[in-house]
């Protein structure tokens, strides 16, 4: 399916629902209508949230990523921060559609992307922790939703010039206080009652005079005291912690729980019918123990409380008349008191939160509003609550149409494009039907409540039938404009309004009572007399000295005034919309009920929204991102374009066969009238991408082969060089090892040779040599002393002392004899020598 319904072709209700279904089945729960986000409740946790996705959507513009609440929150926050424009985020949808979760996601995103710092973090934590407190006191399990908000909430978050949160203000609308005393089968009362009973320890329960079993309380539906997947005890502790973080003191938390317990105990006060002495019906309390416990806990006079529940004081001029109440009236008074106490407690909690998160005066600030309010409701039995809820949605639809058209018109004006009048359904006639100050339904309701005489829902309906009998958007059983006499779906006590989202039949029963919302003054004064500080402060009008005879405004008037203030607030801000839809009534993941979604789409006016958005130009985008996406369609702009963005866009669109009526060039944006044109551009882009992909593949494959060859060649050369080098290294290593071995051997041999004489093994030779040298020396010295005469004829010679000298001794004797002969010859004269020579010759 398409991500933006503006681009849906063909545009009709069936194709719109089919597109939502296709996306839902693929777990794409968000879809755009321009800058509107449609959110489908997935009834499961999807992996599309958290810091990673927040960082992703923070860095991209609205249409660059898939549709997401984060994208809308980012646009709102950046517009507030950078453009100094106050923002509001309107979250609408029926119960169970995921409005509360959507508001949490918006707040968590803003908290994550805004500034840091101890003070800023404290403010962010207080803003975030307000949610569990308001959910506990304002949410309940209904047939459609286990955590349904039973009140409307508008929060203004205020920021400084840097975009850091300073605080905020919360406004609540139309708490469903009737739930306090009665719930439908399969539903629960407000969460806080069950959380208190399940999470409070024994000591606290004893102090509050409560029992743990929810079945013991008339105001609680004991059949569904627990909800699957909801831990009331854990949630109670979370609520206490949240209140502490916000700034509630321990004493304030205790007082809030005591008033909450008071509501439960009031429901257990049983009233029985009695008769006075004159025979008129009266009423009284059956069991005084409950009243006694309430009196002790709240500091009340139990007798006065019992009297206030069973009688009523009326002032006529200067006289006071006490009227006894029958049992039905007394039960009504008891329930009215319980509803008023809880409603005022809820208002007090909201005001107390506002005191903690409010911003000091004098600071310049920017504001982001978040509105989480009921969506359009059509139930089997529609009463006063549905009437005011649908009135509020009519006003919101009016705001949406007017602001959307205004925004379109302003954008066209900024871009210098002629504005074309848009045909759309103006629901102002329906708003006037309801809110007109003199002739509106609410005005008639107030008039009927205030007029003297017999007043009933029937007389109110008769007045409406008379006044609006010819109104095109009003129908009833007796009006003739639509001939509804034979319509069995409408009772005699009903009227029907043709809202923008469809026809709704309202039963006027209890319209008067709910609009009056009266609390007898006796009960108000009794509560004011309480010694309990919080309960006392909830009933300032109970002070007899300050009591005003002026009747308080009716519930309808209060709501109308609140809506008027809200509308004024919304008109002053730049709107952002989140439309929440629930895909099925069973709260099952993956299940899509087309009929249910179609009804909600009508209530939310989705088709009307798309048509308004498409009335002029269906698509618009700044020149730069448009050129970045489509520049590949023109040879002039691909692969590089160095000129102006608008000129580049004109080159791209000029190269395509497009009608000039389909295009409009604004100052900063290109406008395309028909989705078909955009789809044509996308198709051309897809084909061009295929061509470029083929080209890229071809170039890449050639490059890959060349690169592979070069790598193989380099590898072969490297391997060869390595092999040869390694071979030489091994050869050199062997030679070097051999040389080192020989050197080591020679050096060792020389060392051993040099040091051999010092070894023990050479001691014998050394000693033998020494002895031999000693006897040789002695032999030679003795021979020197005993030499024979030098006469030649003397042949005497000393004998050798040892046999080892025999040879040496003979040699010495021979040498000595030759020496003597030489010495004798040297003494002869030459004549004697000649004579001797001749004798020898003879």
Swiss-Prot record:
Keywords per UniProt: Actin-binding, ATP-binding, Calmodulin-binding, Motor protein, Myosin, Nucleotide-binding, Phosphoprotein, Repeat
**Name used for this protein in its record:** Unconventional myosin-Ia
Q: Which InterPro entries match?
A: IQ_motif_EF-hand-BS, Kinesin_motor_dom_sf, Myosin_head_motor_dom-like, MYSc_Myo1, P-loop_NTPase
Q: Name one GO cellular component term.
A: filamentous actin
The UniProt record lists the Myosin motor domain at 1-686
Highest classification ranks of the organism:
Eukaryota, Metazoa, Chordata, Craniata, Vertebrata
Q: Which gene encodes it?
A: Myo1a
Cited CDD domains: MYSc_Myo1 (cd01378)
> Which Gene3D superfamilies does UniProt cross-reference here?
1.10.10.820, 1.20.5.190, 1.20.58.530, 6.20.240.20, Kinesin motor domain, Myosin VI head, motor domain, U50 subdomain
